[in-house]
From Swiss-Prot:
Keywords: Cytoplasm, Mitochondrion, Nucleus, Transcription, Transcription regulation. It is found in: Cytoplasm; Nucleus; Mitochondrion. The lineage of its organism: Eukaryota, Metazoa, Chordata, Craniata, Vertebrata. This is c-Myc-binding protein. Binds via its C-terminal region to the N-terminal region of MYC. Associates with AKAP1/S-AKAP84. Interacts with MYCBPAP. Interacts with CFAP91.
Amino acid sequence: MAHYKAADSKREQFRRYLEKSGVLDTLTKVLVALYEEPEKPNSALDFLKHHLGAATPENPEIELLRLELAEMKEKYEAIVEENKKLKAKLAQYEPPQEEKRAE
């Protein structure tokens, strides 16, 4: 009997945890949205995944990292372009490959 109460207590703690963290509310909202869909999707699981993924608030750090990534990509492209120009400029001052081999 004591084992049964311990398991029940653990379940109750877990239920409260899910409730406090907003999991139950979010799951309920997504399931209600699926229920209210006029045309049910072919994959209910994909529907849930899509809506649960969209339900999480965007972390501000993620947005900052996205912006930083975009900036770094631009800088990278500029550096690659500059590198091409410098190689072309350098090639003007270097002797052709045949002259190098003769030396």
